[in-house]
């Protein structure tokens, strides 16, 4: 669906373009995210988008930043809820895997790397880094901070790899398609249990004082 308005502010134009790029990414893959295609979606000219983003690579970098921010914000909220026992760890795993698979983040990352546009992935890495820093800051012990970093690395790399060749690999090994998600879930459950145990130990120690 095209978005057509005679006048948009610069911020509105950028937002509309990035949202159109996200939809194109999901519908047709990263190769479809071009200035011309996005311009057609929002009723703007190629020159207009060139002014805002500089190039197709600039548009893709803005899209990557948008995906990184939205994905980490959603996952961060889910992690907080899981720490409170309000949602199952599997939800966090599914959100992460779905973002890289159906959400197109994995395909976009591979496309950028293959086209030599590695810098465009910096916003995604930085968004994940900010989320990890936020989670580590609330860890009860340094060891738990390390567990958070380890699990973040595991979860992101598993989700990225699964989005690229999870289906063929699972099939060739005679494993269920969901196996990678199950592995990630087990690791995340162990991390949350370790955090809960540390919290209980801290509360018990405080009660003795």
Where are each of the predicted segments found?
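Amphipathic alpha-helical packing segments from all-alpha helical-bundle domains
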Residues: 71-76, 116-141, 146-153
